[in-house]
From Swiss-Prot:
Entry similarity comment: Belongs to the universal ribosomal protein uL18 family.
This protein's name: Large ribosomal subunit protein uL18
GO cellular component: cytosolic large ribosomal subunit
CDD domains hit by this protein: Ribosomal_L18_L5e
Pfam families, sorted: Ribosomal_L5e
GO biological process terms, semicolon-separated: ribosomal large subunit assembly; translation
NCBIfam families, sorted: PRK08569.1
Keywords: Ribonucleoprotein, Ribosomal protein, RNA-binding, rRNA-binding
Function per UniProt: This is one of the proteins that bind and probably mediate the attachment of the 5S RNA into the large ribosomal subunit, where it forms part of the central protuberance.
Summary of subunit composition and partner proteins: Part of the 50S ribosomal subunit. Contacts the 5S and 23S rRNAs.
Gene Ontology MF terms: 5S rRNA binding; structural constituent of ribosome
Encoding gene (name): rpl18
UniProt keyword annotation of rRNA-binding present: yes
Length: 201
């Protein structure tokens, strides 16, 4: 362990890999609400947070569990399609709460082009939330719709149905054939839009 008068112990959250304080300061200087996106292996969570000296205040939040509970999502809740739908949901919630713009905060997640955290951003932007971004960071549309999953599932089923049922058991037990994920994605997307905008002709 380092010793001596020049050695400074990093803040606890920095040591635990939870907060990049240099990056956080830059975000706070924008004085805009933050669209905070975090992910785990099986879920994503998004929040609109505003800075408060006594503690950050959460305006609205959304969790991928809501996609299952409120909109009938049957796909995986940690993939790109569900991340986009979560972004759409948090975007509409933010607009309803009077939030028109925000700045993206992905914490310590690496800013990898096309990653699921940027699928959340894409959904929020499509809902009408103004967040500075570059179009190049978004996942391709076919990945957002889950077409890559559907194509892989179709090929795997033809090659090894036992492995297909094992790998996509989570989909099948919910009554969704993974080959039909893009259609299911569009159905759930339409439900979210209808809830906040009303039925579209």
């Amino acid at each position: 362990m380092a010793r001596g008068p020049r050695y400074r112990v990093p803040f606890r959250r920095r040591r635990e890999g939870k907060t990049n304080y240099h990056k956080r300061l830059k975000l706070l200087k924008s004085k805009k609400p933050r669209l905070v996106v975090r992910k785990s292996l099986n879920h994503h969570i998004a929040q609109i947070i505003v800075y408060n000296p006594k503690g950050d205040r959460t305006i609205v939040s959304a969790h991928t569990r809501e996609l299952i509970r409120d909109f009938g999502w049957k796909g995986h809740t940690g993939n790109t399609p569900s991340a986009y739908l979560l972004g759409l949901l948090i975007g509409y919630k933010a607009k309803k709460a009077g939030i028109e713009e925000a700045i993206l905060d992905i914490g310590l997640h690496p800013p990898t082009r096309g990653s699921s955290v940027f699928a959340v951003l894409k959904g929020a932007v499509d809902a009408g939330l103004n967040v500075p971004h570059s179009e190049e960071i978004f996942p391709e549309d076919y990945r957002i719709r889950g077409e890559h999953v559907a194509e892989y599932a179709k090929a795997l089923k033809q090659e090894d149905e036992t492995l297909y049922r094992k790998q996509f058991g989570g989909y099948l037990v919910k009554g969704l054939e993974p080959e039909k994920l893009p259609e299911h994605f569009e159905e759930v997307k339409a439900k979210i839009i209808e809830k906040f905008e009303g039925a579209r002709e």
